[in-house]
């Protein structure tokens, strides 16, 4: 398989799974394990670098809202300032846990057995939460209480375990704390911006020696594909979950995790 085709496939996987509650990291790890996509130091970095394409999809889709927040922050708007502070408060737990336990998590937990197990468990939790008779109190992701932002950020830390899903953890936490489905999903998108930019910057600096001009074309392909795919997925996802909830994504997780465990048990 050529590097260009590999970059397209990984870009599609990243763009489709990054903002769905199914774990992009888990799917990329399983793609590497079972289909031999992305093996080697460069491809490990590639899967992080193309996340920037998915991030820019969110920035593009929510540009007006984000721009209004930026303007409001600098002109003294109370809600804009509280939202910016809220995103930072939600982001900080991931920074702390990443610095303290990041190396341990990567060395011990980044394996397909863990991914398959957490996909199944996460799917069961998503099914449970989706069936709860919750009474949403928060309908605007930019106006959650500050403590709610903090609790969502703490929940997001669990997603450092591959297969859990960053968006899944933050969505479940937000819903249990009183957000409606759309607001929970939207805040997971907003929280992704600093979280993924931080991961991108750290990984790029750490593995800068792996990046050469020869690789830039391949990275560009994955970047563009992940951007386009993420735009399509995010627009469809919000409409879908507002009407139908998260059941289909829960079963997606359970099926992929179960098939993965069977394949691993058979020595694949």
UniProtKB/Swiss-Prot annotation:
It catalyses: di-trans,octa-cis-undecaprenyl diphosphate + H2O = di-trans,octa-cis-undecaprenyl phosphate + phosphate + H(+). It is a multi-pass membrane protein. It is found in: Cell inner membrane. It is an enzyme of class 3 (hydrolase). GO terms for biological process: cell wall organization; peptidoglycan biosynthetic process; peptidoglycan metabolic process; regulation of cell shape; response to antibiotic. One of its GO terms (cellular component) is plasma membrane. The keyword Membrane applies. Its EC number is 3.6.1.27. One of its GO terms (molecular function) is undecaprenyl-diphosphatase activity. Its main location: membrane. Bacitracin is thought to be involved in the inhibition of peptidoglycan synthesis by sequestering undecaprenyl diphosphate, thereby reducing the pool of lipid carrier available. Catalyzes the dephosphorylation of undecaprenyl diphosphate (UPP). Confers resistance to bacitracin. This is Undecaprenyl-diphosphatase. It comes from Bradyrhizobium diazoefficiens (strain JCM 10833 / BCRC 13528 / IAM 13628 / NBRC 14792 / USDA 110).
């Amino acid at each position: 398989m050529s590097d260009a085709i590999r970059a397209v496939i990984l870009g599609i996987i990243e763009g489709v799974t990054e903002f769905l509650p199914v774990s992009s990291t888990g799917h990329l790890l399983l793609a590497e394990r079972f289909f031999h996509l992305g093996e080697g130091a460069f491809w490990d970095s590639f899967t992080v670098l193309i996340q920037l394409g998915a991030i820019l999809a969110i920035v593009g889709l929510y540009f007006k809202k984000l721009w209004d927040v930026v303007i409001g922050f600098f002109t003294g708007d109370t809600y804009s300032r509280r939202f910016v502070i809220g995103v930072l408060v939600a982001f900080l737990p991931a920074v702390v846990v990443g610095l303290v336990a990041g190396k341990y998590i990567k060395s011990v937990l980044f394996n397909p057995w863990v991914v398959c197990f957490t996909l199944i468990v996460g799917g069961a939790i998503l099914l449970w939460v989706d069936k709860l008779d919750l009474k949403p109190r928060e309908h605007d992701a930019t106006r959650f209480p500050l403590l709610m932002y903090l609790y969502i950020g703490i929940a997001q830390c669990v997603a450092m375990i591959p297969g859990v899903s960053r968006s899944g953890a933050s969505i479940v936490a937000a819903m249990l704390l009183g957000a409606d489905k759309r607001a929970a999903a939207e805040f997971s998108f907003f929280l992704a911006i600093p979280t993924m930019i931080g991961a991108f910057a750290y990984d790029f600096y750490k593995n800068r020696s792996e990046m050469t001009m020869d690789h830039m074309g391949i990275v560009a392909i994955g970047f563009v594909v992940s951007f386009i795919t993420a735009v399509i997925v995010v627009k469809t996802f919000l409409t879908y979950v507002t009407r139908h909830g998260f059941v289909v994504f829960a079963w997606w997780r359970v099926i992929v995790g179960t098939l993965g465990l069977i394949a691993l048990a058979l020595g694949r």
